[in-house]
């Protein structure tokens, strides 16, 4: 067990923890001895329920489901030490697509609402339900997983970028509201990462189309041309920093969203 962050026995909720960044965060928290409460639609197959891990099948876009899950966690543990708002969806779309048949890659209401419901409303529902308990405790940490897109915008991802920009605003505003209760609110904005399991061929095809390049050019440009450090980030690099923010070692950090982008995004 790795104990340098002193997260042993902390009760920490991670949304979207079945794959990608979320799974990397879950793995690191478990290595630190935390009691991880993983919220997702699907549980994945790496971890199974036990003393230090519990999977909750919850639709975070439903305020009712979220409250029921948080109530159950509080009933079991009597406290919540940390929340990582990681769950999110992204459907690359252009505002106007005059080239694809029938506007295949044009932003539509269904895609717009799905991204807003998960990425924005889901974070609101989770944070409010958890913050009510943290206010009673006079302690806690909320980490919002944003994106470089939320800091600088992104071609073909306007709605996704807008939802992530909203998270950055949540982080700034909630830190001011909750600081007096001993609650910190912080964010991370990952850049281009190694394949996460969420970047499907369909996703890459759509994103490449919105930028008028090939999938091969997309991959080449991402890793070699756009990042000063010369490589994509590792999931573990994001997870390590998130766990640091959850720990008392970061006790004077609140209200900021930190880039983890290899120098690609500045601001």
Curated annotation (Swiss-Prot):
Record flagged with keyword NAD: yes
Domain of life: Bacteria
Pathway it works in: Carbohydrate metabolism; D-sorbitol degradation; D-fructose 6-phosphate from D-sorbitol 6-phosphate: step 1/1
Annotated substrate binding sites: 147
PROSITE patterns: ADH_SHORT
Record GO terms (molecular function): quinone binding; sorbitol-6-phosphate 2-dehydrogenase activity
Record InterPro entries: NAD(P)-bd_dom_sf, Sc_DH/Rdtase_CS, SDR_fam
Summary of subunit composition and partner proteins: Homotetramer.
Name assigned to this protein: Sorbitol-6-phosphate 2-dehydrogenase
Organism listed in the record: Klebsiella pneumoniae
Name of the gene: sorD
